[in-house]
Amino acid sequence: EGALQDIYSRIPIEKLKNRGYSTRVVVVDGGSSDNTVSIAEELGCEVIRQRGEGKGAGMRQGFKKFLEIGDDELVMLDCDGTYHPEEITRLLDSLPENGIVIGDRLHGNLHSDAMTSTNWIGNQLLTWLAVALHGKPIYDLCSGFWAFSRNAIERLQLNSMRFEIEAEMYTSCAHRGIPIAHVPITYSKRVGEAKLGSIKDGTSIARKLIIRRIFPTPHEER
């Protein structure tokens, strides 16, 4: 709730329209108890009310809606004030044909108060583990700022429920030959309390990377 209005106001809608994009802003609400839904609706956003709990469940529901609507490209960013929506055009400019692009915080403008040393070290270790296990280069595994072509989303095979979703998107790209590009981005201190728990969620992400090395395809997409 705290960052939504500011983030919406900074989306470069006019610049995107001038480039030929027809835009829509979609908010996936994971059962929030604050004013997120009412603020989103007042701003003119489309709201998806998430079924089930967890970031992964919400993202997969958003992907499904995207494919039903029939749009061509999708930009995803966490709505916590850490990512700069002004940089959406930079991601779209670098989007490979039939691929995805990941905003790279670790080689971009990472503000000094934006990430704890524990999270920075954990992200580096998880990113190293991802490449060691799956071979495809990636520089910021846990980034929450991605852009996707429609073809890439159609090919992703996912069943993650929580914060391991980005890791599974990466492994699916690695095993299905989906092109990945990387763009350095700005990363600022978040608004509000973080939901990502360093140890618990880091362990879940590592487990997902290992499982997808042994079983590249989910047994069941929930």
Model-derived features with residue positions:
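A conserved acidic beta->alpha catalytic loop
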Residues: D29-V37, G81
